[in-house]
Amino acid sequence: MGKDSSDVTLVKNSDNIVATWSVDGLTFTQTVTLANTKSALHGMASISYGVKSTDGRSADSVQARVMLDTALGYQDYAVYELTKKDSTYEQIQSETVIDNSDGEAYNNALFGYDNPKAPSVTAYTVNASINNKIVAPYQIAFGHWNNLASSVFDFEPDNSLTFTNPYNEKYLTADSAYALYFDMGSVAANGEGDT
């Protein structure tokens, strides 16, 4: 991670799981909460992040990458559909990075499904709002799990790699993941931020 980092600590509460770790004077907190434990629609979770300066120094630009591994039943990959601001969809099956720094490439939701011709399993990602402000990533990376997981933050896609192809030459497996990149802004000395 950084020059000065800690191991991740986990705390399981009655309604969430909290992971905490530190890097270079910043303490990060990830909270995963089931969205509605009484719902028949199991598996909907809320993921939030917080950062706090713990060494008396400020941080000008804190960014976070959230990598999510997609498994749909026994299938370890998804065909992704990115919702766009103009109400169209972009199907993604090859490694790519989408620049959303202007907020125009992504309309706060994406989904993946097992079969583009006859979907039977679907997974969704919807960005929430904090204090009436939509929290959207400035960048989204889609890739083969092996390639995306081997990068810590920056990701160089192999645009010729189709991650839904079990016979791709690089990994000989179909496997996908995606990463959402968030700008958490600046953090004042001993201050906090969240996403």
PLM region spans:
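Acidic (Asp/Glu-rich), glycine- and aromatic
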Residues: 40-108
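A eukaryote-biased signal for short, well-structured alpha-helical docking elements
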Residues: 8-17
